[in-house]
């Protein structure tokens, strides 16, 4: 074997060593990045992110590993908050003033308005999964249904739409094994069918971002343990399965803020033990977190920020 051949073989050996080192370094870097990632999910890669508030309220927050920042919607954004009485209490905790202050400090023009939906008449004072599905999916189109605007109408005027359920949503009956999207009966299986239709419908309007509250809880005096457990099961499903990263739908975890990880609205956060409306204490706590969550969604952090609105 001549000198030229020996030199060629030596060059090949050195190249192999260098490639091996490079591959090992890349793999190690990827492993380091994975191990240092502080984003959590509720799947097998999940870890808990528990936050304790000054008032002692504790929340368990999860976000998805596939989450990425999205583009900001800009500085001029119209926001519509659809609600009933529970939402009205939180609104009264200072939501409007929070946005006024934020706009003044940040030079933005985030314009938020609230609206009762659906109204007491002619539709009826019901804002549960069936009712949103009935108005927005079952009666979709450019014409109002019983004087209630469809998504085709709302999205033509609004950049962000926030919707929620009032606390009777947590009074859930047992499943019967036959989910019915057209049923007004409050069961987990019916809720899931209605939420599936709502997700598909909201995704038809990619220029509009939606913020969905996890449902309001009932006090212990107002609900059974079985029903309250079903409520927690459903709202956990909303967070961990129904809500997916990368689309135009986001969740604000009001249920977790209310229940502190339990099954009921605690009496110290309720209007009274047998009145499941939130009190002023909870409203003052929740209002800025709600407002911050909406801003996170507007500014592209909907999939990466905490779903309670905490920093």
Describe every region a protein language model picked out:
Residues 1-10:
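Bacterial N-terminal signal peptides that target proteins for export
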Residues 9-18:
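Bacterial N-terminal signal peptides
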Residues 21-68:
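Ser/Thr-rich, Pro/Gly/Ala-heavy low-complexity intrinsically disordered linkers and tails
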Residues 64-116:
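Serine-esterase "nucleophile elbow" of acetyl-processing enzymes
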Residues 78-82, 88-89, 110-116, 159-165, ...:
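Structural recognition of the beta-strand scaffold that forms the well-ordered cores
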Residues 103-140:
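A short beta-strand-loop structural module common to alpha/beta enzyme folds
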Residues 135-189, 215-220:
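Oxyanion-hole/transition-state-stabilizing segment in secreted/luminal serine hydrolases
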Residues 218-311:
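Catalytic His-Asp segment of secreted/periplasmic serine-dependent ester chemistry enzymes
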């Amino acid at each position: 074997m001549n000198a030229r051949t020996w030199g060629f073989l030596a060059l090949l050996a050195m190249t192999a060593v260098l490639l091996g080192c490079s591959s090992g370094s890349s793999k190690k870097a990827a492993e380091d990045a994975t191990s240092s990632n502080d984003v959590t999910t509720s799947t097998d890669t999940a870890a808990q992110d528990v936050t304790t508030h000054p008032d002692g309220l504790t929340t368990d927050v999860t976000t998805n590993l596939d989450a990425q920042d999205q583009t900001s919607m800009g500085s001029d954004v119209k926001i519509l908050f659809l609600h009933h009485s529970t939402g009205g209490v939180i609104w009264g905790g200072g939501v409007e003033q929070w946005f006024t202050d934020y706009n003044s400090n940040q030079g933005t023009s985030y314009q938020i308005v609230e609206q009762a939906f659906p109204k007491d008449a002619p539709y009826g004072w019901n804002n549960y999964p069936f009712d949103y599905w009935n108005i927005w999916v079952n009666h979709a189109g450019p014409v109002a249904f019983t004087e209630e605007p469809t998504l085709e109408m709302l999205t033509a005027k609004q950049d962000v739409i926030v919707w929620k359920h009032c606390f009777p949503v947590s009074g859930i009956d047992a499943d019967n094994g036959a989910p019915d999207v057209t049923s007004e009966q409050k069961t987990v299986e019916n809720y899931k069918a209605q939420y599936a239709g709502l997700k598909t419908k909201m995704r038809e309007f990619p220029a509009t971002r939606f913020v969905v509250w996890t449902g309001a809880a009932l006090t212990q005096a107002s609900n059974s343990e079985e029903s309250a457990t079903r409520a927690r099961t459903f709202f956990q499903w909303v967070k961990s399965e129904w809500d997916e990263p990368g689309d135009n739908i986001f969740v604000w975890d009001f249920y977790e803020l209310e229940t502190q990880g339990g099954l009921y609205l605690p009496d110290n956060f309720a209007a009274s033990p047998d009145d499941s409306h939130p009190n002023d204490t909870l409203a003052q706590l929740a209002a800025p977190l709600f407002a911050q969550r909406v801003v996170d969604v507007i500014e592209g952090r909907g999939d990466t920020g905490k779903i309670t609105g905490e920093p």
